[in-house]
């Protein structure tokens, strides 16, 4: 938005204050400024001169030599203009002037010195076309020696305001509103208030008809006669041009002028056109779907039912608050008009803008939310401006219309302690009263309690709560005057989130230590995928309509991880992934939602792989990884139990048991499941219930398991036995552990073999047991004694030695 300093000076003496002071106060207390520029400063080098004489050029038939007078001296100009004569007042660009890309220099034309150039309106960028030098004879204000910039009222400073910084301040979208704000901030008086304009309405004139409804906050119309449509006076033209508004004629220009001055849009209808429709009967109503009529911008959009229209005798003549109709617009021969001044709900104007795609200067102001009581004062001001701008004898009927909330008030209650606490400084009641009254609030105190009546131009959406008052006081006093002090806050040890802490440990160990990659999946999946793990009847269905493959919440993570492997099986030979995720069940809380830590591994073994040795090695490798993870999170007492699962191969399905509770599982995914997911390779899948894992870890995390290393050499005993093809290898290690051999530190399976000389249905399993003595070196006799004990234990329990 562009604001003219000269225009704002009509309302308060801003020119008496230094420009630097104004700019600093705007930046600190009002809004952001994109730029401050003088308007058309190049026209200071173009003066009005009078042609004293004209002579033919001695060496060029189409050139003339003119002697001109600028009020203090004479100079010689060579010109090719044919429309000038002695005595004419014309604009002269003197040497040093820059007009567009052209710089005027003192030069010689065919041997004759020329000290400048006569200018046309086009050369001065005042018109798109011109027929010759601009002749200024008889034009008001055209005086010899005056600069064109002064003649055109262009001697001005333009403030370019950042619109987004005043979106919440509709009162600042006008010259008077901004001047009023600056007057408050700089302690300047208001010398003229356009909202206090007076006008004597002609009570004998026929009144227009306005149908009252709830489609506008306020709507008034007045009939105006003895109107003459002519070009606007220079003052009006220049002020509109400085704000980037196109000049049209004196009537339309006044409508734009009053909008820029007071922030309230108005509209003029050609009364003769309205009467041709059967009389003047205006109404605010909604469009009919598909309705269309020509607008001022030559478009005819198809309208939606949510768009507000102005109708006359039921026919559309304007899109309310956005743009007028072409047929009802003021014409060059218009002598009577109907003036409209209205305020519409901002949300309705926003819908019209969105639907039509039209964003006008009027709609920009309406969408911010205007104060409804301004409609009548704006009519009075516009009538005064029309009279000043070429319609000296106009008459106007008394405005007719409605105002729904004439006595709306917003009162805010707070106390001095609240204000000072929020600002972080100590202000007295006098300080607060001074600031608020300068901002046009009405203030009253009862002890430390404050009541502030918000001015009408601020109470719609801007200032409504005590915090808004604090902001007004703070910005007016100046945020730069508030001393920066460090915040005082109690330092507390943060509460440990054990679940989050263990989750980070798990992710770090699996990704950094074991080379797994973390994956993220949606919780939506197909109902048939929930059949893999659990009761499908407990599936949680998604209420809003979804595709069949995303119709329920998952009850385990196996389907998600298998789909991840399917996506990547042709890209990588080995896939190791894990996911932290939730599973959902249609049962009462808190068991309706569980968090799982699940993982899946594919070692590039085809689903038809029949080499049991390779498959068992892969499985033992993954199991060893999980056991190292359990040790990492301080879970030392556990065992693996054979437990069939429908999604696991019956020969490779284990449950992890800790403290007699199952906390997870591990196994080869069943070939039928692999086929259903179109998987070409064997997959090992495992899952741990995370809440149970957290509980066990929390119990064990402070227990020290450190053992002082023995100073004596360790010993190892290997033993190989035959066990059933489907028997758990833990059976023998559990038997050994229960014997409580003092020197026995640990035991594990280090190899397995099936086929060859091994009987059918059996497999050869080799165990290794580590022996540690803290008191003396092992003797061969003691090692043999323990070895014989293990052999006897195996035979006693039906195991055959290899």
UniProtKB/Swiss-Prot annotation:
One CC-aspect GO term: phenylalanine-tRNA ligase complex
UniProt keyword Membrane present: no
Record's catalysed reaction(s): tRNA(Phe) + L-phenylalanine + ATP = L-phenylalanyl-tRNA(Phe) + AMP + diphosphate + H(+)
CDD domains recorded: PheRS_beta_core, tRNA_bind_bactPheRS
Signal peptide, first to last residue: none
GO biological process terms held by the UniProt record: phenylalanyl-tRNA aminoacylation
Keywords: Aminoacyl-tRNA synthetase, ATP-binding, Cytoplasm, Ligase, Magnesium, Metal-binding, Nucleotide-binding, Protein biosynthesis, RNA-binding, tRNA-binding
Domain of life per record: Bacteria
Enzyme Commission number(s) of this protein: 6.1.1.20
Ranges of residues in domain FDX-ACB: 710-802
Coiled coil: none
Domain B5 positions: 407-484
Family assignment from sequence similarity: Belongs to the phenylalanyl-tRNA synthetase beta subunit family. Type 1 subfamily.
Name of this protein: Phenylalanine--tRNA ligase beta subunit
